[in-house]
């Protein structure tokens, strides 16, 4: 069932969350434990992240190095299939421009089609660690809109080389990302909203936000996009604050602000345990306010914060 239909199928604010595929060489059991921990809150869908390959240089000796391509977290498609089959919960794999050619994407879509996984989250993805700006893969894409167009063509029965596909089963549906505090590479919010509108016009059925800690910014963002004629669900993305080190790390890494009230309270914490309790309390307050204002769904980012998300969900669901 499409994500938008899953959201509409409940009278209450829907619950969903995101997980990462396991590191290369490790098993899937830890992911099962995460799902088992959060399953009691009736997740309508589970997102599975995709991670681009990175180039690393291995020393060969005599001053020579060999450049190799490595992916630390492969297995997105397999994890999506395993979770959907084990739990009968809709899974939403991420589809990236970053690190993928058009042909790579086509093979992923074919695998997903065979498996009956038809919900996607379409993203440009991050730049490579060694790059100062985003560089697309050879024969790849610069923008999520281009990726949407390939998915649309696939749904219509056209391969990237123009040859026909025998389309069977349910066509792909997809959402996209948005940022209530502006994408770091966009000069202003007006342009950010312009590109979001283009992504919706290309076929995205909903948008899920980057994490935020200030509900005011989310509400203002939704008001602005509605004025621009964007009427799809804008799903808030939430991650509990849980460590003292995150006071500086979160703004630096994710280019988002921490409200002064949260930052001031965090600076009073003496231990990570105190910070985690504060983060849970803050997140519960955030979620209750969002629910009171009628958000269709709350999407949680529980990486390294599964127990915190569980405590928040217990309080609000």
Model-inferred region functions:
Residues 125, 138-171, 176-185, 223, ...:
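Active-site pocket-lining/capping segments in soluble small-molecule metabolic enzymes
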Residues 101-114, 191-195, 220-223, 243-249, ...:
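Catalytic cores of alpha/beta
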Residues 18, 46, 112, 199, ...:
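Conserved, mostly hydrophobic/aromatic
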Residues 41-74, 128-138, 204-220, 303-305:
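Glycine-rich, proline-tolerant flexible connector loops at the mouths of alpha/beta enzymes
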Residues 14-32, 90-103, 173-191, 267-281:
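Active-site mouth loops of central-metabolism enzymes
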Residues 102-149:
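Flexible, glycine-rich active-site loops centered on histidine and acidic residues
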Residues 1-44, 48:
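Conserved N-terminal beta1-alpha1 strand-loop-helix module at the mouth
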